[in-house]
């Protein structure tokens, strides 16, 4: 099983439209307030309670994950897989900044 799939913005947005998945923003609250994708759920990766917060989510669901530039998003995807998340995990290459 692949840890996660790194997607271009075009493919990521097509997954938002076609895949039954949870959209997860792992940036901090200030970044989220400055702008975020519609219907995104904020779970900051740098929050010390990230693992605890993620334990409330369905480990069999599919996830679309993004951060500001891609670094935290990759770490979050790997962490989710190590926590036993078995659904498909998709990561937005270049993060939210890459959408501009």
Residue ranges of predicted features:
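Rhodanese-like catalytic fold shared by cysteine-dependent sulfurtransferases
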Residues: 1-21, 29-62, 68-100
